[in-house]
Amino acid sequence: MSSTAAFYLLSTLGGYLVTSFLLLKYPTLLHQRKKQRFLSKHISHRGGAGENLENTMAAFQHAVKIGTDMLELDCHITKDEQVVVSHDENLKRATGVNVNISDLKYCELPPYLGKLDVSFQRACQCEGKDNRIPLLKEVFEAFPNTPINIDIKVNNNVLIKKVSELVKRYNREHLTVWGNANYEIVEKCYKENSDIPILFSLQRVLLILGLFFTGLLPFVPIREQFFEIPMPSIILKLKEPHTMSRSQKFLIWLSDLLLMRKALFDHLTARGIQVYIWVLNEEQEYKRAFDLGATGVMTDYPTKLRDFLHNFSA
């Protein structure tokens, strides 16, 4: 390569790196900041699955009472096309009955067991008396002013349409975010109702990471408004150490290193995209998330997170 060609190549590369760095720090030079209809620091996962039975009205009422900023819940659809709040399509884990929600009418759904495992807390269970699977419309009616984060659990066109209709009926486009880790589900949600903000699918999260590490992210427009990701390191506390291989531990470490990036979070939040990290249940995890620049934390223990935020901001 001639010295002239090398000079132009290095000049171009240098200009790209400088421009990328500047736009990473100041993205509004190129992109209009997204309007934030609400801001959520405190997010109750399944209503707070460590303090009440998950996805029940009792859980949601408790979370709202202590001041949560957002309820996170999961939706399925019954045989008679009722949108219900439940994490699992198959009810064996939660009710002890090996049936699918989609195979039953709403009136036929069995009640939750009185005690359920807390999915993101090892060797921990939660008890509760409210064991009824609620309808999504009940949640909307009970909490008209509370932001709600809806995980569309199955790729079902009727479910997506019904959820959209309920959001519109209760005038909640400005208080709702929906989507799933599945790319196709998120695309269908956006196509069904683009007025409801969407979250990043797993495929889009991986794309964002690729763009970030290559310096291209500052140049790319983003449609989504909510970047919801796990903190990979918490997997280590959920499993017995001796059951994990060295390669598994390395992959968790590497995933955490790549995903938990303050520069990435700062760039996204500067563009008006909220960053939520799930599912964190310990104070050191809360602190790490907020120190990294996360907008909000999703937890099974809303009371614990409320107390932390009170002390953290004091």
From Swiss-Prot:
GO MF terms, alphabetically ordered: lysophospholipase activity; metal ion binding; phosphoric diester hydrolase activity
Membrane topology (Cytoplasmic): 25-195
Keywords, alphabetical: Cytoplasm, Endoplasmic reticulum, Hydrolase, Lipid metabolism, Membrane, Metal-binding, Transmembrane, Transmembrane helix
Annotated localization: Cytoplasm; Membrane; Cytoplasm, Perinuclear region; Endoplasmic reticulum
Lineage top rank: taxon: Eukaryota
Enzyme class at the top of the EC tree: hydrolase
Signal peptide from the UniProt entry: none
Catalytic function, reaction form: a 1-O-alkyl-sn-glycero-3-phosphocholine + H2O = a 1-O-alkyl-sn-glycero-3-phosphate + choline + H(+); 1-hexadecanoyl-sn-glycero-3-phosphocholine + H2O = 1-hexadecanoyl-sn-glycero-3-phosphate + choline + H(+); N-hexadecanoyl-sn-glycero-3-phosphoethanolamine + H2O = N-hexadecanoylethanolamine + sn-glycerol 3-phosphate + H(+); N-(5Z,8Z,11Z,14Z-eicosatetraenoyl)-1-(9Z-octadecenoyl)-sn-glycero-3-phosphoethanolamine + H2O = N-(5Z,8Z,11Z,14Z-eicosatetraenoyl)-ethanolamine + 1-(9Z-octadecenoyl)-sn-glycero-3-phosphate + H(+)
Pfam families with a match to the protein in the record: GDPD (PF03009)
Tissue expression summary: Widely expressed with high expression level in testis.
Activity regulation, free text: Lysophospholipase D activity is increased by magnesium and manganese and inhibited by calcium in a concentration dependent manner. Loss of lysophospholipase D activity by addition of EDTA.
Protein name per the record: Lysophospholipase D GDPD1
Gene name of the encoded protein: GDPD1
